[in-house]
């Protein structure tokens, strides 16, 4: 069949006029069809297959229809793939019969470029591929599998690997043939039994580089479902990984982003990761055998030879690679501890069960010591033998220590791959510096596993590795490097060693291949098939992995001062780590995240010490790292930190001081640790007092992350992922007089009437009404005039109490008053305080009336382990003192008015500024695309935040449409800081609108 024939068939059966171009394929005829009509889809793929494969084609169609239905029923953010869609014929059929015992299908063409169009791919693309396979597997896990579905003899089905062994002799190259035979045999004998214990599902099974469609850096589709099988999902990931490998020297490192990306879309289990490396090798071996089989049958089919040159090289590289190290790398990339036995080894050593001897100079605890800093930032540290000797003599030290996990600048030469992206610089042992000839002792009972003279420059020199076992027989090792050559003479493999036996002496510098006399002592939970060449220095970008393989040996040395330098990872590696060890429900600011390492006043500084004006973090109420607040915490922490079951003046004095800022009768204080806790306790107080549960809340409000508080936070329960409004909650429209339900001079009274209507509809006794005095997550909404006073009156008339959430806006931030509720001339029954109270330290409080506090005395003790501890109370008192004594409330009023006045002036020439609102330094600037329609400028707002970051200003946004700049800086901002913001805002809006 040629292109003209294909076009005629498409026109006849589908009524679509197209021009066709043939595409390569292994078993099918494929044509890319471009419509000559201006209506309908522009491009298609026409697939022609043998009628003998009808049952398999029907299965493929069922999968495609299922995926199309799945995509239409879930949020696009949960399934971002665009899979081909079946086109029905003029007779309503998705599968048509053709002459010569053939079947035809027409599918929509997925636009984009193929993975194979690019020779190399970056980490983002690899992660996107992994995510795509994971999303597809997650969707297909719900596909109902009928008996016999996609069940046929199929060489590409890993579960049928045994059938390939009889064809291995077709592989021409003898060396490749034996590697392939060994790989497939190991799969049959060791991997297939493990797969049989795993759940099976439909998998795509063909994520090769010609079946992956990309748009920019994102994989948007996996096409060609001709190889679908029912198997454990890890088999499909192995296929994609095999084709995704590009790094010839370190292929596994190159695909870690792919594995991590899959895990983030569809979390992998430990048993799946244990078989991934053998399955990758099996897929490559399978490809080599299948190519040999098919080439013998069709020697002219060039498609069959694609990737084979690459795979014959790759199978050799992977055959030489460590299965353990590859397994550990996959685990670490998915957030698991690299070596699954490392935890047991560490716990056994720390248990007190084994007898542990000092490695040098017993009793080591009493030996005079000093520490050397060889980190990359260290300058002038002694490194030569003479320098070290002088430094130790001057310090009166008999022993000098070089730390574990120290990122050093002393490793040079080919051994350390200095020109590689995985250059090794992080020390994995503890160095024990002492004169040559100093005795070295075995730390634990064991046997000699290995010994050698590693004589390459800056290597170990003479080295001994001892093998030990935990009580459960788990092996681990201790390594002693830089020894004297005579130390190796009496050794033999398997020689028994007892803890405390002298096993060596420290070598001279010439024996230690360039290092000053010392012993490198290392603890290892695996030798990862490296023997005496096991890394004593790790690449920084795989440090979490190597900390598992080679834990801190101080659990053996027991140096009270500690030995861990905690080498600092690069920002990109921290981002990767964060994705797998912290919940991805935690968001990050900015498209390209920034690592912040310190703060001072109104500024934050990144890892290159670049300053950023912080207009976002109202937590740092009196300025980042305020010296008075820091000092208060340090001094009290050095003295005492305990709980409130003991008398301590700090907690009592601070409670009195905090209550003195409140109007009567608010004078009873409860301490907690966060704003969420404060609001949860406020609910308990209200319920204890009213014996009711009904709640009134403002729309779009957020009051915290605790379950009870999510229930009264429409910002959470009414948005994506939320469970909807609970029965005991009624939502009042946000009293927004700019673009809300009611506007004008009487808007406040109309919103109060809305509250009355919700109250009447409640159908149960009212417990409380909770609100912020400026609604932050709604877009820094200043409540319409008169609303709050009228609302409080209605609530109290109904028997409820009024809760003022001051977590964000309290303690002088609103400028004209110390507390936000004072802006409205009301006095609440309960006040909750959070973010500003500790200037970054976790302290929060609830202040209420004696009457409500009395109602809480129901026989159940209130105790909060950390709430009101002396350190927190001392910090809180210092923050309050700074606010009052440095006039920060007045500064908030002055700077806030200056900022808002200037932005309002700016709005006269920049019509994207729809509204400027707030009080003091709690401000919202709403951006719109049209002043008349008030259409939210969501994209502009996001672009402006990125623009401002590049100009050294941190901004963020809020509101239902994410189009309101929220401005809530530390109260210490100065006019020059505001001027910087105004300049950036003007430039950004001018450039971006």
Regions found by a protein language model. Give the residues of each.
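Zn2+-dependent peptidoglycan hydrolase active-site motif and core
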Residues: 442-487
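A cross-family kinase active-site recognition segment
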Residues: 90, 118-175, 200, 693-722
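Acidic, glycine-rich catalytic/binding loops that coordinate metals and/or anionic ligands
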Residues: 346-376, 489-511, 517-568
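An alpha-helical support segment within catalytic cores of ATP-dependent transferases
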Residues: 2-11, 145, 161-205, 215
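A conserved alpha-helical element in kinase catalytic cores
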Residues: 48-100, 118, 123-127
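Conserved N-terminal phosphate-binding loop of PLP-dependent enzymes in the Aspartate aminotransferase
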Residues: 568-993
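ATP/Mg2+ or Mg2+-diphosphate-binding catalytic cores
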Residues: 166-167, 287-340, 939
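Active-site activation/catalytic loop segments of kinase-like enzymes and analogous catalytic loops
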Residues: 234-267, 281-298
